[in-house]
C-alpha cells in the first residue's frame, strides 16, 4: 500500500548500521486474541505517535489465526494511515517494517482497492482517510505509451477483456517503472504482452479473491 519493500536477506548488522533501526517490535497475541487483532490494537494505541513498528509476518494465502499474515497486516496498516516498507529475514522469519505514510506519497491501485473494501467493512479510521489520494476508480487512466504498446502488439482488445481491477493494477505496476527504471519497464511490458496474448492473468492481483474484480 506503494515505498517498494527492500529485498529480503539483508544482513541484520548492515541494516541496523545503515538506518539505526531498533530491535524488531514483537507483537504477540494475548488472551487468545488473534495476531491480526493484536496488531490492530497496537495501532489503535500507538499509530498517532509511533514512528515505526517491526512485526513478523507470513506470506501467502491466510489459512489460520496463528500467524499475522502479510495481507492482514497491510490492511490494518492502511486503516490507520500506515504503510509497509523494508523487510528483513531473522532466523528464517520475515520481519516487516510499518510506519506512517507520508502525505502525497504514491498509491498503488491495489492499495486503493484494499481501502475501498476496508471502508465497506467499516474498518477505516479518520487517520487512514486523511492520507488517501483521489479514490474514484475513474481517476485512473492507462498511460498512453502503454496503451500504444499493447495496441501495436495486438493485445489491447484482450487486455480490455480482463477484470477492470486487474487492468488497473497491471497498468499501474508496469508504468511505475517507466521513468524509474526503463530496463525493468521493458521487461514488465514484455511480460504483460506475452501473458495477455494467451489471455493469462498473472500475479495475486485480488488478494486471493478478497477484492472485487
State where each predicted segment sits.
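Charge-dense, helix-prone N-terminal extensions
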Residues: 2-213
Amino acid at each position: 500500500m506503494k515505498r517498494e519493500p527492500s529485498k529480503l536477506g539483508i544482513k541484520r548488522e548492515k541494516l541496523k548500521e545503515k538506518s539505526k533501526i531498533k530491535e524488531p517490535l514483537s507483537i504477540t497475541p494475548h488472551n487468545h486474541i488473534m495476531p491480526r487483532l493484536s496488531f490492530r490494537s497496537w495501532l489503535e494505541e500507538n499509530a498517532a505517535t509511533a514512528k515505526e513498528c517491526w512485526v513478523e509476518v507470513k506470506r501467502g494465502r491466510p489459512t489460520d489465526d496463528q500467524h499475522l499474515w502479510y495481507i492482514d497486516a497491510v490492511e490494518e496498516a492502511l486503516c490507520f494511515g500506515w504503510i509497509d516498507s523494508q523487510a528483513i529475514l531473522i532466523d528464517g522469519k520475515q520481519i516487516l517494517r510499518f510506519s506512517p505514510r507520508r502525505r502525497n506519497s504514491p498509491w498503488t491501485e491495489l492499495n486503493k482497492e484494499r481501502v475501498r473494501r476496508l471502508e465497506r467493512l467499516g474498518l477505516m479510521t479518520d487517520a487512514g482517510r486523511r492520507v488517501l489520494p483521489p479514490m474514484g476508480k475513474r481517476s485512473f487512466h492507462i498511460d498512453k505509451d502503454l496503451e500504444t504498446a499493447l495496441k501495436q502488439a495486438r493485445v489491447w482488445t484482450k487486455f480490455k477483456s480482463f477484470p477492470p481491477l486487474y487492468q488497473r493494477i497491471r497498468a499501474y505496476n508496469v508504468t511505475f517503472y517507466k521513468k524509474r527504471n526503463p530496463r525493468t519497464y521493458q521487461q514488465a511490458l514484455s511480460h504483460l504482452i506475452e501473458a495477455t496474448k494467451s489471455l493469462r492473468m498473472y500475479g495475486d492481483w485480488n488478494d486471493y479473491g478478497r477484492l472485487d474484480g
